[in-house]
């Protein structure tokens, strides 16, 4: 009993610890410990089911979510636990799915949504596995799906669909592998022959390169006596390395053709044949055919071919013919040839770049001197050479530089891209520049297909979007009441201060004078300056008529000032007359409106009395009055006729509006 009590308390503690987490799943170690304790006895199963149902009543969706995970693990493994849970299935579904309106799922809402979807998924899984044995489980699933119309994930249909898709993919893969196997079986003899010929050519080239004539005896045999005298292992290893190094043959002008053939064959064997052999081996391992004898024989031959290729590769690597070394040698020769071509000019002048010249000079200095110069000296020499080069080019080609600077200033600025790499290039590019073997199920593949230069230029065409240059809009700079200047940036008119005009730092407008005013100012300034000059100086001037000109300018200035004063007084008088006229018009309009309103009231009273006292006589022959008749009668009435003179007066006022704009 004590052992059981200890186990019961332990399982309760583990379950509570597992459900207090904030993770998306239960800790696997705690779940494993719970399952191992529950497996101990039936009492542990009953205690765990009771504890889990109590935790499902907790007012937090995260606790219910983790509790549901533990229930699912134990439900799929224990028959007793299933029986105990199905007895309380109604309560479990309402607490996990929340289909009852009076028992909604607790907060947080995101975890509650996940709890609901997971509970629906677990219920469908339980029904698929144990619905045949438990009627309550079957009825609960049917009620939620058909009555409440809950959306289930339909695990069985999804599993069947996934299984069907996987089978279809496997069938397609088998069919593709079978077709590849048939094509490999047809061309296997030719494929094997090509690889054998390539390996044979590589061996013959290596024999030609390593042949030493009559002195073809290995150095190890000649030095066998000396080799026995060396007792130290370190010295012996150095001796072996030196012997191996002496066996390596360097590429020269005599054996260059053999090296080129060896380089091409090695590249073909590694980049093409070795990859094809490895693909064929993987194909034969995966393919499922009825004729296993043919497949096994082909697999054995491919393994032997792969071993021969690897052996040949190891042999030329031991001999010093590595691919990287051969390509480096070939590239260095090409660069040397290019440098020789650059130095051979018609006039004997050097036209290469300054940086290349400096680099060449540094290489010659390094080859002549055993000690290497420091980085500071190298930088100094490069800077001096560069400055000398720039000065020489400036002196020689000033006209060319001016034309180049002009073209650069007119040229548009573009972002660097791949289209500038092939600018005005007329070279054609191969479609399959990698040298791979491309297969196509739609037709024949041309391995030597090329892309013309005009097509490359069309593919590298770049579209640019026009961008308008941004111009800075000047601020309003009008003075504000609270101090400072207005900083609004409008194009023409500020909504608070009117048209935008040039202003100074204090907010005052800068008046832009007309050419006439400028001429007047110039004349006035000249006259002012001339007035300061004494009469003796003016008379002593070379021009005798200068005094007469000054007097004429002064008289003209006085006349203009008098004219301006007359115009100013006349405008002031007109303004006073307009003001008096407006006052008289307003006074007459006020008097006319009061008398007219009294006359209209008397007229309305008279008409209303006549209509009231008039006897209503109806005649069948009398013509009915229409709206048009009433309007015409109204227009020709005495009241309208009395207003005609006033309308004519209004017409006259409209005619005179332009002449006297401020008069009413």
Curated annotation (Swiss-Prot):
Chain intervals annotated as zinc finger (UVSSA-type): 473-500
In the UniProt record, does the keyword Zinc-finger occur? yes
Which domain of life does the UniProt lineage start with?
A: Eukaryota
Q: Where are stretches of biased composition, namely Polar residues?
A: 363-374, 388-402, 521-533, 640-650
Q: Where is this region: VHS-like?
A: 10-153
GO biological process entries: response to UV
Q: Which InterPro entries match?
A: ENTH_VHS, UVSSA, UVSSA_C, UVSSA_N_a-solenoid_rpt
> Where is there biased composition of kind Acidic residues?
334-347
* UniProt feature, compositional bias: Basic and acidic residues: 377-387
Coiled coil region boundaries? 148-180
Q: What is this protein called?
A: UV-stimulated scaffold protein A homolog
């Amino acid at each position: 009993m004590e052992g059981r009590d200890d186990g019961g308390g332990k399982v309760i503690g583990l379950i509570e610890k597992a459900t207090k987490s904030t993770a998306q799943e239960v800790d696997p170690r705690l779940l494993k410990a719970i399952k191992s304790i529950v497996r101990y006895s039936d009492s542990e199963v009953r205690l765990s089911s009771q504890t889990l149902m109590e935790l499902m009543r907790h007012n937090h969706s995260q606790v219910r979510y983790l509790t549901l995970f533990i229930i699912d693990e134990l439900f799929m493994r224990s028959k007793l636990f299933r029986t105990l849970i199905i007895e309380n299935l109604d309560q479990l579904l309402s607490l996990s799915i929340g289909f009852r309106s009076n028992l909604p799922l607790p907060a947080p809402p995101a975890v509650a949504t996940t709890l609901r979807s997971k509970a629906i998924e677990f219920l469908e899984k339980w029904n698929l596995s144990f619905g045949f044995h438990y009627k309550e489980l079957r009825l609960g699933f049917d009620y939620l799906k058909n009555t409440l119309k809950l959306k289930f994930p339909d695990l069985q249909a999804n599993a069947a669909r996934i299984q069907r898709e996987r089978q279809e993919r496997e069938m397609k893969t088998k069919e593709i592998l079978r077709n590849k196997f048939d094509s490999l079986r047809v061309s296997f003899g030719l494929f094997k022959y090509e690889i054998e010929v390539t390996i044979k050519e590589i061996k013959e080239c290596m024999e030609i390169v390593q042949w030493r004539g009559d002195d073809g005896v290995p150095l190890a045999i000649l030095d066998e006596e000396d080799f026995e005298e060396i007792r130290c292992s370190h010295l012996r290893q150095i001796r072996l390395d030196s012997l191996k190094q002496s066996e390596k043959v360097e590429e020269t002008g005599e054996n260059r053709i053999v090296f080129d053939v060896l380089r091409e064959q090695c590249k073909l064997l590694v980049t093409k044949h070795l990859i094809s052999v490895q693909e064929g081996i993987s194909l034969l391992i995966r393919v499922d055919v009825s004729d296993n004898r043919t497949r096994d024989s082909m697999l054995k031959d491919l393994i032997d071919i792969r071993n021969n290729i690897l052996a040949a590769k190891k042999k030329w690597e031991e001999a010093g013919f590595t691919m990287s070394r051969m390509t480096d040698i070939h590239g260095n020769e090409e660069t040397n040839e290019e440098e020789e071509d650059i130095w051979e000019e018609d006039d004997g002048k050097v036209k290469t770049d300054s940086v290349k010249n400096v680099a060449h000079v540094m290489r010659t200095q390094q080859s002549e001197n055993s000690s290497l110069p420091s980085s500071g000296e190298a930088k100094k020499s490069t800077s001096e050479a560069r400055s000398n080069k720039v000065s020489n080019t400036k002196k020689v080609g000033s006209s060319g530089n001016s034309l180049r600077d002009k073209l650069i200033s007119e040229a548009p600025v573009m972002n660097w891209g791949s289209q500038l790499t092939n600018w005005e290039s007329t070279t054609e590019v191969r479609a399959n520049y990698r040298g791979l073997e491309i297969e196509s199920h739609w037709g024949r593949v041309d391995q030597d297909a090329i892309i013309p230069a005009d097509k490359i230029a069309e593919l590298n065409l770049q579209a640019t979007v026009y961008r308008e240059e941004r111009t800075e809009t000047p601020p309003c700079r009008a003075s504000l009441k609270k101090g400072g200047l207005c900083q609004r940036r409008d194009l023409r008119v500020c909504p608070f201060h009117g048209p935008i005009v040039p202003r100074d730092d204090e907010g005052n407008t800068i008046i832009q004078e007309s050419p006439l005013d400028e001429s007047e100012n110039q004349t006035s300034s000249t006259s002012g300056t001339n007035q300061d000059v004494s009469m003796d100086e003016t008379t002593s001037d070379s021009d005798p008529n200068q005094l007469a000109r000054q007097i004429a300018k002064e008289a003209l200035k006085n006349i203009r000032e008098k004219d301006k004063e007359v115009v100013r007084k006349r405008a002031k008088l007109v303004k006073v007359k307009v003001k008096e006229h407006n006052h008289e018009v307003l006074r007459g309009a006020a008097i006319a409106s009061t008398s007219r309103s009294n006359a209209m009231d008397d007229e309305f009273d008279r008409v209303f009395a006549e209509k009231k006292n008039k006897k209503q006589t109806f005649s069948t022959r009398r013509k009915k009055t229409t709206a048009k008749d009433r309007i015409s009668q109204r227009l020709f009435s005495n009241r309208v006729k009395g207003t005609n003179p006033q309308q004519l007066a209004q017409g006259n006022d409209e005619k005179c509006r332009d002449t006297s704009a401020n008069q009413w």
